[in-house]
Amino acid sequence: FLIKQVAHKLKQENDGLDKFVTLSPAPGFVQWLKEKSINKDADEDMLLKQALIYLTASDREDGSPNDPVAKFHLGNGAILERINLNADLSSKGLIQSKGVMVNYLYKLDRLEENHELFFKTKEVKESDAINNLRKKLQIK
């Protein structure tokens, strides 16, 4: 895994570095909302709920996540760590994702396991924060 090699190199060069988290866009989110006839100007809880569904559910024939960036990171063994509203307020960020950005956490000791699980089952590994958000927003 290239990510594991890069992470180990970074750890060697930066003593104490032990957490590898991305801040990634969700470039198809607004288009997906339009396709689902969901108001992109909904309140924050509704936006969070829809972002979580967009990132973890699939409308695709292969069962992969709707979001191509999610598919990339999850396929590389990351877990869905956090969804951030109003994180990209650039015009492109607002047009493509309503400002939503996503953290993916790479746990180096779990990369292969998560990668294999994702490719076999398309299961999205989620952090405790995402599980708590799921409960709060009443998403199964």
Task: Give the ranges of each region predicted by the language model.
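Extended, composition-driven regions rather than compact fold-specific motifs
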Residues: 4-140
